[in-house]
Amino acid sequence: MDYFELECAVENWAEEKGILDKDQGPDNAATPMSQALKTLEEVTELCTAINSDDREEIIDAMGDIMVTLIIQAKMQNLSLEECLESAYNVITKRTGKMINGQFVKDN
């Protein structure tokens, strides 16, 4: 599958699992915040995998992060593509420098 087929498959999976179903009731319905917390959980797993230099776990965590972001985008009536394009359009104009292994933007 190409990327866009995978994105669509993830959206369909989320629909099938009821993640995007707003009629799950207040205690069971997924919300943008609960999905954001799931993303944070997966990012933590990525950090653990990187710290352990575990390539398979890095791949798994990055994939899981993408899944949570695709679902979040769907919840927000956005596409990951438009979010990425928006961010790219901002960063291409950004100036800054590398500090301690990270790019730090100028104010």
Label the predicted regions.
Residues M1-M62, M66-N107:
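Flexible "arm" and connector segments at domain edges
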